[in-house]
């Protein structure tokens, strides 16, 4: 972790008029939902609405496009979730937040640059990398992180256009929504995705997939899953895909009963799972999606450097919803393993970082130095602040907390030397950074939409 004095030195500034005579200059790094919500809440804060304060906000992203994981981390057959983009577009379309795409923090602009041009900086860079699954065999060909697969099927520019989809039987390790997304996309017939925004290369890859069986494994019981009811129910909507569950996986302890009594979402999901359990109709689909509970991964089995199986250990509930191993092992013959055990944030240059949690250390959004002192003017929001937990509602409340603290801290914010908004453009242009603006992105998006439509039309014929 970076020592406090190094970070403080990067923030040294020359005094200039305070924010009683000019707008408060704020940079938000990361143009996903967390960053956009934070910027939006600043513009709608009470000091701004009352006329006490003016704000000037610049939103930065290392990609030419805004929207972060909503654009590159949500399955293409989730139009309802991607509908959030409509709301985010309306925020940026107002014109009171400037967008700078294709600008990378730590490369194109350093911390000292932000310190010279902004009173405060909010980091909203998220958690986009796969948390590791530390078991033997994880290095074998055929083992993939779920985040990488999601990025591929969403057309992320950092990932190859092709993906290895030769496996007939596939394992997905994890019991959260990302695991369900991965399993659903792998098991779904490609032609049923043509009504979505699926990229053409992804459609072609999935179309050629020989998959027949996808297994989802969770180490705890049905009452401890981390899905949401909507995601779970969507599994049953896939054409020509049977849902398969197993009687021996349906165990409930006192903690399970308490969870079902106290949490309606859990009660609804258990009811859905029990309905599938009771369904004894013939399984005639050409593809099957198996849901396994109370099984923990112990080893990826391989031959000649490639995946040939996954060894799972049966677990038992301990009475409080936790589990322990039983010593009973089952080997599943699979040719690919996807691990979806969580996301992890990455270290940002010149900032402290908690490697274990994958977050910027902070106190309710105020960035902390190694010794626990507050680094005035630096803030965090979203998953880089709290870790990869919570949906859009949590992201909004999280952003509000950070913004409120930023506004409270105004008397403590260091002065800056270049308050003129145009000075940031001048720096980027002087360094040869080809940044995109909101207007430029709209033109790019319109072109991509037209290109995608013509591609879908051709594939559908």
Task: Give a label for each model feature.
Residues 21-32, 166-173:
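Beta1/beta-strand and adjacent pyrophosphate-binding region of the FAD-binding site
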Residues 26-50, 180-186:
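N-terminal Rossmann-like FAD-binding beta1-loop-alpha1 element of flavoenzymes
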Residues 46-59, 184-328, 406-414:
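Dinucleotide-binding/catalytic capping subdomain of oxidoreductase cores
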Residues 52, 56, 63-120, 266-286, ...:
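N-terminal Rossmann-like dinucleotide/flavin-binding domain of flavoprotein oxidoreductases
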Residues 120, 124-131, 176-177, 334-347:
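Glycine-/small-residue-rich beta->alpha transition segments that form the dinucleotide
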Residues 130-208, 359-368:
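Glycine-rich dinucleotide-binding loop and its adjacent helix/turn
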Residues 142-160, 300, 306, 318-386:
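FAD-site-proximal beta/loop scaffold in flavoenzymes
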Residues 366, 371-461:
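C-terminal, flexible cofactor-proximal segment of oxidoreductases
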């Amino acid at each position: 972790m970076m020592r406090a004095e190094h970070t403080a030195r990067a923030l040294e500034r020359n005094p200039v008029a305070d924010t009683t005579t000019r707008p408060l200059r704020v940079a938000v790094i990361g143009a996903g939902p967390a960053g956009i919500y934070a910027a939006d809440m600043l513009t709608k804060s009470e000091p701004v609405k009352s006329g006490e304060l003016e704000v000037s906000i610049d939103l930065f992203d290392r990609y030419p496009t805004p929207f972060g994981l909503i654009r590159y981390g949500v399955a293409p057959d989730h139009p309802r979730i991607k509908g959030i983009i409509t709301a985010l577009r309306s925020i940026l379309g107002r014109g009171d937040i400037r967008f700078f795409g294709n600008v990378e923090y730590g490369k194109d602009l350093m911390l000292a640059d932000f310190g010279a041009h902004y009173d405060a900086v909010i980091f909203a860079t998220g958690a986009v990398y796969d948390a590791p699954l530390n078991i033997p065999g994880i290095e074998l060909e055929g083992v993939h992180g779920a985040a990488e697969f999601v990025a591929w099927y969403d057309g992320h520019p950092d990932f190859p256009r092709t993906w290895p989809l030769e496996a007939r039987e596939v394992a997905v390790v994890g019991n959260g929504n990302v695991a369900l997304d991965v399993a659903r996309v792998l098991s779904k017939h490609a032609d049923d995705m043509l009504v979505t925004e699926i990229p053409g290369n992804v459609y072609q890859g999935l179309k050629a997939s020989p998959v027949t069986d996808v297994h989802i494994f969770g180490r705890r019981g049905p009452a401890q899953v981390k899905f949401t009811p909507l995601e779970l129910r969507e599994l049953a909507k896939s054409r020509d895909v049977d849902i398969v569950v197993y009687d021996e996986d349906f165990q409930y302890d006192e903690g399970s009963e308490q969870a079902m009594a106290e949490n309606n979402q859990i009660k609804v999901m258990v009811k859905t799972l029990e309905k599938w359990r009771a369904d004894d109709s013939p399984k005639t689909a050409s593809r099957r999606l198996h849901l396994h509970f109370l099984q923990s991964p112990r080893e990826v089995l391989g031959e000649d450097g490639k995946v040939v199986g996954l060894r799972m250990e049966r677990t038992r509930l301990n009475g409080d919803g936790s589990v322990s191993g039983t010593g009973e092992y089952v080997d599943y013959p699979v040719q690919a393993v996807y691990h979806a055990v969580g996301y992890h944030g990455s270290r940002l240059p010149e900032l402290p970082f908690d490697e274990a949690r994958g977050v910027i250390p902070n106190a309710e959004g105020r960035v902390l130095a190694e010794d626990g002192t507050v680094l005035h003017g630096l803030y965090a929001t979203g998953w880089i602040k709290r870790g990869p937990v919570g949906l859009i509602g949590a992201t909004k409340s999280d952003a509000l907390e950070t913004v409120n603290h930023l506004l409270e801290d105004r008397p403590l914010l260091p002065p800056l030397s270049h308050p003129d908004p145009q000075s940031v453009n001048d720096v980027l242009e002087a360094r040869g950074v080809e940044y995109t603006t909101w207007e430029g992105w709209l033109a790019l998006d319109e072109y991509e939409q037209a290109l995608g439509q013509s591609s879908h039309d051709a594939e559908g014929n």
